[in-house]
Structure formats: C-alpha cells, structure tokens
Swiss-Prot record:
Gene name, Swiss-Prot/TrEMBL: bztC
Family, per entry: Belongs to the binding-protein-dependent transport system permease family. HisMQ subfamily.
PROSITE patterns recorded: ABC_TM1 (PS50928)
Keyword Iron: no
Keyword tags: Amino-acid transport, Cell inner membrane, Cell membrane, Membrane, Transmembrane, Transmembrane helix, Transport
Name of the protein in its database record: Glutamate/glutamine/aspartate/asparagine transport system permease protein BztC
Length: 434
C-alpha cells in the first residue's frame, strides 16, 4: 500500500446537470410519465384535448360580434367561411349585455348600479386587507343601508331610521355589557331597537320626509335580474351567514339546553332540506303565515332563507375548526382570567376561523353558484331567466351556447377571485414552521 497522497491543485469546471434531471423534462418525467398508468392517462388526455380544440376552435374563431340578429350572424359566417361553416354569434352578448348584467333595471338609473358596485369594492377593502386604516370599517358598516337605498330607491329616511335603531342597539349594548353581561345586554338592546322600529320609525320618517324630501325613483324588485340579482342575493347571504354561522356553531357547543337544542334543530333541519324547497317556501308558503295585506318583498324572502341555508353549512365548517383546537387553548384562556366571550373573541374563534378558511370559502363559492336556483321561483337569474328572455326575442331565437358561455365566464371570474383570496389569506395567516 503506497503512502503517496494526491492533492489536486486546480479546480475542475462544474458540469451542467443532466438534461433529464432539471427543467421541463424532469417535471414531465415525474408528473406525466412516471409510470405506465400515468403515461397512458397523459396520452389519453392529450388526444382528448386535441380533439376538443379541433372541434371548438373553428366555432370560436368564426364568431361574429357585429350583427343585429342570429340570421345576420349566419349570413356573415357563410359569406366569410363558406356555406357549411359554423360559428358563434357573440353579437347577442354585445346587444343584450345589459340584460345579462342588470336585468330589467331602468337604463336611465344605471348610474345607481355603478355607484353601488364601486361602493361594494370600497366597503370590502378594509375587511379584506388589514393594511388599510381601521376607521374605514365604519364605511363598511354603513354601506348596506346606502346600497339598499341606491338599488331600490324611495325616501332616504327609511335607511336612516334603520341606522338609528342599530345605533340605539349599539349604545345600549355598550352601556349595559360591563354590568349585565353580553347576552342580557344584547337582548335588551334588540328589544328596544325593535320597539323603535315598530312604533317610532314610521312617524319620524314621515315627519322628516315632509320637512326635507330626499328620495330616489323607486325600482320594483321584479325589475332586478341577471348578475345584479345574483350579487344582491349572494353578497348579502355571504356577509350575513358568516356571523350567523358562528353563533350557531357556538350555540351547538353551549351547555345551555335551550340554546343547544335550538341551534342543533336549525342546523339539522336546514341541512336536511334541499335549497329549492326553501326557495319554494319563500315564494309560496311564507305568504300564508303573514298578516293579510302584508307586502313582503320576494327578493328579501329569498335572501333570508338562502342566508339561513348558508349559515347552517358555515356552522358545521366552523364546528370542525373548533373541534381541531387542542384543549390547551381553552385552558390558556381560563388561566388568563378571560370570560367566555373574551376567550372566544381573542383566542378560540380566530384560530378556528383560520383552520376553517378552505371550507368557509368553498361554502361561499357554492352559495354564489346556487343563486341561479332562484329562477325556479320566478326571478330572472343570469343563467336561466335572462337567457330564456333573450332567446324569446325572434332576432336571437336559436342561440344556445353563447349566453351560457358568457354567464359561465363571469361566474368563474367571481369564484376564482374568491378562491385565490382564500389562498392568499391562508398563506398570510400561516404560523407553523414546517
């Protein structure tokens, strides 16, 4: 055995990594061709994609945007691409876009819709992005009343009286909560606010309207339709169902028998009944239980029951988040001397909501898509109601895929945005160190 050692005095130039171990080729080997089954599925998927593109591409590329009827669309396609060619008649979207978006809302009042939608984004901004000043939350709280007045019109003093009732509720709750506790003070505030709305609001509204008449032209609910209707129902149900679902989830875990029984009953009943049944109840049966002569708006009835339906599912999602928390979190709250509501607000519920983000957003996406079911109770949703109205016009009779594709793209835009925001929120709130 030799004692002579060898020491290299110069560095070798680094060699590039094998082509099969880096870049796109490596990714394809690991994800698309990692085995016989994956290879077969990849080849089948490629063949199906090629067939679909070959079938759909001519129809999409031959589409016509400038026409006044389906007959004119077909004539233009035949002139450009031959008598046997087919193509999409996108002109129906160009001509009827306002009905798909706004239903039968008066055209001269579209400015109210634009102001409402711009206000919606401004109201959601401080809720979705905590970098903004917290004082902007006051604008978020005032937005629902302003949006109601802008959309439906009428005297401004109606929303003002509703705001006054909530102000009374908030003042009483703030004053009584330290002495009587959260449940009792909230109950007293609700009773006083309800008495104000029942007996004092109407005379005050009439007096203010006679002294200072401020009103917008009224718009009936049967003129709502399209994505305006979907957003009114969907956004309202999403915003209200989350706090209501939190209360139902906490009620289901309560030690008080009445509260727990009511919460379990509401959750199980609503989850066990199809949404379409609740919509028919809102449309037909609910009117029989109201006093004679009561005019309870159909959209409001639908919003209430859709909100209850969503809240029941949100409650179960949040209950799963609560169950995932270790017992030590509750013990830590007790060790700090926090009462029940302080513990829920500061320690328990923030962690449960963070765990439940994927399930909550999935419920919201499903809820927004389910707004199309209101077509079965006579409302003009964008998918079925407005599409049928457009096709009932002889100029566009025969169009089929174009309205559905347009509506699907807009639904995808909203739902994809919600999905991406939930992923952003999960990354932002991630606190583990894996």
């Amino acid at each position: 055995m030799s004692d002579t050692s060898f020491v290299r005095t110069e560095m070798l130039a680094p060699r590039p990594a094998p082509v099969s171990q880096v870049g796109a080729i490596k990714w394809m080997r690991e994800n698309l061709f990692s085995g016989p089954l994956n290879t077969a599925l990849t080849v089948f998927g490629l063949l199906a994609t090629v067939w679909l593109v070959q079938a759909a591409a001519p129809w999409l590329l031959h589409g016509v945007w400038n026409a006044n009827s389906l007959t004119e669309c077909r004539a233009i396609i035949a002139e450009r691409w031959g008598p046997e060619a087919t193509g999409a008649c996108w002109a129906v979207i160009r001509v009827r876009w306002n009905q798909f978006l706004f239903g039968f809302y008066p055209v001269d009042q579209y400015w109210r819709l634009f102001v409402t939608f711009a206000g919606l984004f401004l109201a959601l901004a401080p809720v979705l992005f905590d970098a903004l000043p917290r004082k902007l939350i006051w604008g978020t709280l005032l937005y629902p009343l302003a949006a109601f007045w802008l959309l439906w019109g009428g005297p401004i003093w109606g929303p003002v009286s509703v705001l006054a009732g909530f102000a009374i509720l908030g003042l009483l709750f703030t004053a009584l909560a330290p002495k009587l506790g959260v449940p009792v003070s909230a109950g007293i505030g609700l009773v006083v606010a309800a008495l104000f709305w029942l007996y004092a609001a109407a005379p005050i509204e009439a007096a203010l309207q006679s002294a200072l008449p401020l009103a917008l032209p009224e718009v009936d609910s049967d003129q709502f339709g399209g994505f305006l209707l979907a957003l009114v129902i969907g956004v309202t149900a999403i915003v209200v169902s989350l706090p209501l679902g939190i209360l139902l989830a906490l009620g289901r875990q309560s030690d008080m028998l009445i509260v727990k029984s009511l919460s379990v009953g509401i959750i199980e009943f609503v989850r066990g009944v199809p949404l379409i049944t609740l919509l028919f109840t809102a449309s037909l049966l609910l009117q029989y239980f109201l006093p004679p002569g009561t005019n309870f708006d159909l959209i409001l009835r639908v919003v209430i029951l859709v909100t209850l339906f969503a809240a029941a599912y949100i409650a179960e999602v949040i209950r799963g988040g609560l169950a995932a928390l270790p017992r030590g979190q509750y013990e830590a709250a007790d060790a700090l001397g926090l009462d029940y509501w302080q513990a829920q607000r500061l320690i328990i519920m923030p962690q449960a909501l963070k765990i439940s983000i994927p399930g909550i957003v999935s419920s919201f996406i499903g809820l927004f898509k389910d707004t199309t079911l209101v077509a079965f109770v006579g409302l003009f949703d964008p998918l079925k109601g407005i599409s049928n109205v457009v096709r009932s016009d002889m100029a566009w009779k025969g169009t089929y895929w174009e309205p559905y594709i347009f509506v699907a793209l807009i639904f995808f835009l909203f739902n994809f945005s919600m999905s991406r925001y939930s992923m952003y929120l999960e990354r932002k709130l991630k606190r583990d160190h894996r």
